[in-house]
Amino acid sequence: MKVDPNKEKALAAVLIQIEKQFGKGSIMKLGEDRSMDVETISTGSLSLDVALGAGGLPMGRIVEIYGPESSGKTTLTLEVIAAAQREGKTCAFIDAEHALDPIYAKKLGVDIDNLLCSQPDTGEQALEICDALTRSGAVDVIVVDSVAALTPKAEIEGEIGDSHMGLAARMMSQAMRKLAGNLKQSNTLLIFINQIRMKIGVMFGNPETTTGGNALKFYASVRLDIRRTGAIKDGDEVVGNETRVKVVKNKVAAPFKQAEFQILYGQGINRTGELVDLGVAHKLIEKAGAWYSYKGDKIGQGRANAGKYLTENPAIATEIDKTLRELLLSNPSALAAKDDASTEDNVDLETGEVF
């Protein structure tokens, strides 16, 4: 299609004017934007990284992680912080719930000496701290725990029983408008942990909703629904949880995928167990009876012993991890979908639509 040369000249002139006024990169053709290849940070779980499609959580975006109590929300964010710190990134934890356990964080691999931590008095203060850290351009990952604990100043200064209808939602809406652009410019990942509430009087569809209004749902590039699906036992003692994470919303890859992994108490995500399972599924690790072998060498009898071997030999674990990432991220459909999820589990949190 032939373009009018006068229009081309006018467009070139206005582009030069815009870049002169607002800076280089303020406007460009979509195909020229090299930043479309999204930089990511691992979640600590290989299967979740694959389910996300891009290999982890995207930098410069807002992410929401929600689920019931004790489902692993904070553990997952601490795993993200540990992964980011291993890459030399600076992280901050806004502890609005005043419940962060530094001993547990250290066990998960978090460098607590270099983790910035704030325990704000009000929701406005927490969000202003987020904005200041973002605009500095010096912080790579910020975690807010949690949206439900971001209490507006008016509510704190008022009396118990006073009505503050929609105050938290307005606060979050204003904060999202302010933060979204700054996050993109500074390439900062902002993770909000959220809790679940029940809608009153819902007869059909899913009665669950998240706190803080609708703004976060719209501005989040990724929303993760994390659930505990079972217990892991060592004899009669419960030592961890079977966990399922569903990608409810994803703006950087295809949504609605899910991942299953184990969270062990005091240890975090069971990476080596995940490597053994995925390695066997994709024929990187051979299994004969109860014995597991890698490249012809036996690595253990039983899944637990094979996982222990990989823990003691991190070079081999890294090699398997790298091979699996190359295989699965180039072909995400290779990660077999779990067919045992119930219809109720596959209901969109907001619309009630089955997917």
UniProtKB/Swiss-Prot annotation:
It is found in: Cytoplasm. HAMAP family: RecA. Can catalyze the hydrolysis of ATP in the presence of single-stranded DNA, the ATP-dependent uptake of single-stranded DNA by duplex DNA, and the ATP-dependent hybridization of homologous single-stranded DNAs. It interacts with LexA causing its activation and leading to its autocatalytic cleavage. It comes from the Bacteria. One of its GO terms (cellular component) is cytosol. Its main location: cytoplasm. Keywords: ATP-binding, Cytoplasm, DNA damage, DNA recombination, DNA repair, DNA-binding, Nucleotide-binding, SOS response. GO terms for biological process: DNA recombination; DNA repair; SOS response. It comes from Shewanella baltica (strain OS195). PANTHER family: MITOCHONDRIAL DNA REPAIR PROTEIN RECA HOMOLOG-RELATED, RECA. ATP binds at G67, P68, E69, S70, S71, G72, K73, T74. Belongs to the RecA family. Pfam families: RecA, RecA_C. This is Protein RecA.
